[in-house]
UniProtKB/Swiss-Prot annotation:
Belongs to the OMP decarboxylase family. Type 1 subfamily. The active site is at residue 73. It is an enzyme of class 4 (lyase). The lineage of its organism: Bacteria, Pseudomonadati, Pseudomonadota, Gammaproteobacteria, Enterobacterales. One of its GO terms (biological process) is 'de novo' pyrimidine nucleobase biosynthetic process. Homodimer. HAMAP family: OMPdecase_type1_B. It comes from Klebsiella pneumoniae (strain 342). It comes from the Bacteria. One of its GO terms (molecular function) is orotidine-5'-phosphate decarboxylase activity. The keyword Lyase applies. One of its GO terms (cellular component) is cytosol. This is Orotidine 5'-phosphate decarboxylase. Pathway: Pyrimidine metabolism; UMP biosynthesis via de novo pathway; UMP from orotate: step 2/2.
């Protein structure tokens, strides 16, 4: 089985930056995308954009050379989640995610759904604890563990289920790399260059701090999308990361 998207036209990037596209309008989103280079980043499409614009928007990004992280955080019964993950693979996305709290059977079903795609399968990662959540939020759900300990528990479960990695906060990256090894991918939202506002993220780091902590892919939104010169902002971030490497 192969994905329907044409992969040969996509740019190959070594950048760990994934730009979060948070637009409610296709034309505005593509106007931004056309100002940046697919060699400088990948793009993240989340629930709002995918609900509004559908799979064709992902194809539009592919046609412009970008690899896409489809951030839909699937969380359902195992069979439904597996079918959704397979549909994402058919679309040709680079990465797709599920909620680790969906449990072992759900995550295993999702992983097995990607086996027919072979080397063309997207990376499959799991969300541990949302970066907006604090200890008090978990306590409201009856979870007495700290965000870090709960995330570690879910990350260990994710690895046992054979997924490629997890979404986690940068603060947890050092611990996860030590406990789960370098091959286990860490994807971190809430990354903001020095001087950026925190917004609705609570556990944030700069790109340089995240890289030093062991983050493999860092999601950056408004500091790039709201920049007067997003291409220059991306280049500056990548240069700063290459100096730290």
């Amino acid at each position: 089985m192969t994905s329907t998207a044409i992969t040969s036209s996509r740019a190959v990037t070594s950048s760990p930056v994934v730009v979060a596209l948070d637009y409610d309008n296709r034309d505005k989103a593509l106007a931004f995308v056309d100002r940046i280079d697919p060699r400088d980043c990948r793009l993240k499409v989340g629930k709002e954009m995918f609900t509004l614009l559908g799979p064709q928007f992902v194809r539009d990004l592919h046609q412009r050379g970008f690899e896409v992280f489809l951030d839909l955080k699937f969380h359902d019964i195992p069979n439904t989640t597996a079918r959704a993950v397979a549909a994402a693979a058919e679309l040709g996305v680079w990465m797709v995610n599920v909620h680790a709290s969906g449990g072992a059977r759900m995550m295993t079903a999702a992983r097995e759904a990607l086996l027919p795609f072979g080397k063309e399968a997207p990376l499959l990662i799991a969300v541990t604890v949302l970066t907006s959540m604090e200890a008090s939020d978990l306590q409201d759900l009856g979870i007495t563990l700290s965000p870090a300990d709960y995330a570690a528990k879910l990350a260990a479960l994710t690895q046992r289920c054979g997924l490629d990695g997890v979404v986690c906060s940068a603060q947890e990256a050092v611990r996860f790399k030590q406990e789960m090894g370098q091959a286990f991918k860490l994807v971190t939202p809430g990354i903001r260059p020095q001087g950026s506002e925190a917004g609705d993220q609570r556990r944030i780091m700069t790109p340089e701090q995240a890289q030093a902590a062991g983050v493999d892919y860092m999601v950056i939104g408004r500091p790039v999308t709201q920049s007067a010169d997003p291409a220059a902002t991306l280049r500056a971030i990548n240069v700063s990361l290459s100096k730290e490497a």
